A protein has these predicted regions:
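Nucleotide-activated chemistry modules centered on ATP-dependent adenylation/adenylyltransferase
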Residues: 2-255
């Protein structure tokens, strides 16, 4: 049986190893809410959520908010603000933070957008995979990893779904990513599941949803669905669908 090397922290702070195979077997039949509850009970103060405040982000944030109401233990929500998000995303974030009473932690690159462009140019315009990898490392992966380190996070949950990309289709509910546990409560959810959950709980849609966007990231690399091109295939003109945050390599290696 595989024994993972990343330590888990119990609620009282005592370190203990996680048996990855056993944890996956335990998580497989659980609902998304039950997976979140398991993670909070297992990792205690070392558990956090990440969010992009994108089209489907409200679902996991709402679940975390409801769990906090039950347990009385707020879950930190880490948001990577690249400095290039659409105005609508910033407005949507403010609305959800207020409505769901989120404990928000904003992570930003130590390098301002202006400085990055002065030193490296507009990396998203070159259509070069290496430039996109550098962009994602500077603006997304490094800020996230720094924030998780500052918060002493040992497990973070995200809203990735298996149907979004080929890479995500092969994911497990729990994996080790860059020396931390990565939990995917919504991995088996469909777009329909997301939509009906938001309708049932009267969660607001991202303003760009009504303009035909099924996913939204930075303003310069997101587009509404068009014909056969939809979802994350609209990112960076279809050149790249993963930003490195959910990839196992150090600081986005292999993006």
């Amino acid at each position: 049986m595989q024994m993972a090397q990343v330590p888990a922290l119990s609620p009282d702070g005592a370190g203990r190893p996680i048996d990855l195979d056993a944890a996956r077997a335990l998580l497989a039949p659980l609902s998304a809410q039950e997976r979140l509850s398991w993670a909070q009970n297992t990792f205690g103060a070392g558990f956090a959520l990440t969010t992009s405040f994108g089209i489907q982000s409200a679902v996991l944030l709402h679940m975390a908010s409801e769990l906090t109401a039950i347990t009385g233990r707020p879950i930190p929500v880490v948001w990577v603000d690249t400095g290039y998000l659409p105005r609508e995303t910033y407005q949507y974030a403010e609305r959800l933070v207020e409505q769901l009473q989120l404990q928000l932690v904003v992570a930003q690159s130590a390098m301002s957008p202006a400085r990055m462009e002065a030193l490296h140019g507009r990396l998203w315009e070159t259509d070069q995979p290496g430039d996109l990898a550098l962009y994602h490392r500077i603006r997304k992966v490094e800020p996230l990893d720094r924030a998780l380190t500052d918060l002493a996070v040992t497990c973070w949950a995200s809203g990735v779904r298996g149907s979004q990309t080929d890479h995500r289709k092969a994911m497990e509910p729990l994996d080790a990513v860059r020396q931390r546990w990565s939990l995917r409560p919504l991995l088996s959810w469909s777009k329909r599941d997301v939509y009906y959950y938001m309708e049932e709980h009267k969660l607001p849609q991202h303003p760009l949803f009504e303009q035909g966007y099924s996913t939204v990231g930075d303003w310069h690399s997101s587009a509404p669905d068009l014909g056969d091109v939809s979802g994350r295939a609209t990112r960076f003109g279809g050149l790249q669908q993963e930003c490195g945050i959910h990839l196992p390599g150090l600081m986005g290696e292999g993006i």
